[in-house]
């Protein structure tokens, strides 16, 4: 019924258009009964179907969704921290992905290929799993602690960072690390990122030369 009314409207509207208008000859032929159509008349506020005066009109047609165009549903998000280029089906990868039905070998192959140039680093990855068992993933930057240890040339941080210092990095090294971590930090400037990374370094017993943070002062009770 709606389709029939629409065809009648289009035919009547087409006949009321200016005789030389190309739209008047093709409007009815081009509009699909499956399309959602909005017809807007521009000009004086009077019925266009009852007037013999030519009218301009705007036709907005929206095509129906394509077959199979249904959006995928996210069924899980998995976060892992893996060594670059060395992902295998062994834990933690296998159990984490297997429980969601993800193709484990396909993930390992893709992850290793995308991190091959970062050998020696731990690269966090966030995997989004969909209801059809397909997946996508994004790589994060290495943890700041890993970058700081690499820059300082030490294997681990200090158990007592205030008293036992394990290494020193330069201000240029700090800036390089801050620039790399900036996309994952809750700040927008390199200076703010440097202060955040410097705080992490201080908690690990790694000094910055020259320092950019004021030393903590112990409160003295009188």
Curated annotation (Swiss-Prot):
Residues of the transit peptide: 1-62
GO CC annotations, alphabetized: chloroplast; chloroplast envelope; chloroplast stroma; cytosolic ribosome; nucleus; ribonucleoprotein complex
Origin superkingdom: Eukaryota
Record bears the keyword Protein biosynthesis: no
GO molecular function: rRNA binding; structural constituent of ribosome
One of the GO BP terms on file: translation
Disulfide bonds: none
Alphabetized Pfam families for the sequence: Ribosomal_L11, Ribosomal_L11_N
Family under the similarity heading: Belongs to the universal ribosomal protein uL11 family.
HAMAP family from the UniProt entry: Ribosomal_uL11
Subunit (UniProt): Part of the ribosomal stalk of the 50S ribosomal subunit. Interacts with L10 and the large rRNA to form the base of the stalk. L10 forms an elongated spine to which L12 dimers bind in a sequential fashion forming a multimeric L10(L12)X complex.
Function: Forms part of the ribosomal stalk which helps the ribosome interact with GTP-bound translation factors.
Protein's UniProt name: Large ribosomal subunit protein uL11c
Biological classification of the source: Eukaryota, Viridiplantae, Streptophyta, Embryophyta, Tracheophyta
């Amino acid at each position: 019924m709606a389709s029939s009314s629409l065809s009648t409207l289009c035919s009547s509207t087409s006949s009321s258009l200016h005789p030389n208008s190309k739209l008047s000859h093709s409007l009815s032929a081009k509009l699909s009964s499956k399309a959602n159509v909005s017809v807007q008349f521009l000009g004086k506020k009077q019925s266009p179907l009852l007037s013999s005066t030519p009218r301009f009109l705007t036709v907005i047609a929206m095509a129906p969704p394509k077959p199979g165009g249904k959006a995928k549903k996210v069924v899980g998000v998995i976060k892992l921290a893996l060594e670059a280029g060395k992902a295998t089906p062994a834990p933690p990868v296998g159990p984490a992905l297997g429980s969601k039905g993800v193709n484990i070998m396909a993930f390992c192959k893709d992850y290793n290929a995308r991190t091959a140039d970062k050998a020696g680093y731990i690269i966090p990855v966030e995997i989004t799993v969909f209801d059809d068992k397909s997946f996508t993933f994004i790589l994060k930057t290495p943890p700041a602690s890993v970058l700081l240890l690499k820059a300082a040339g030490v294997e681990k941080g200090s158990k007592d960072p205030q008293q036992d210092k394990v290494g020193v990095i330069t201000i240029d090294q700090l800036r390089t690390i801050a620039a790399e971590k900036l996309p994952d930090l809750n700040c927008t400037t390199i200076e703010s990122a440097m202060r955040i990374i410097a705080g992490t370094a201080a908690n690990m017993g790694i000094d910055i030369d020259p320092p950019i943070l004021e030393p903590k002062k112990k409160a003295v009770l009188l």
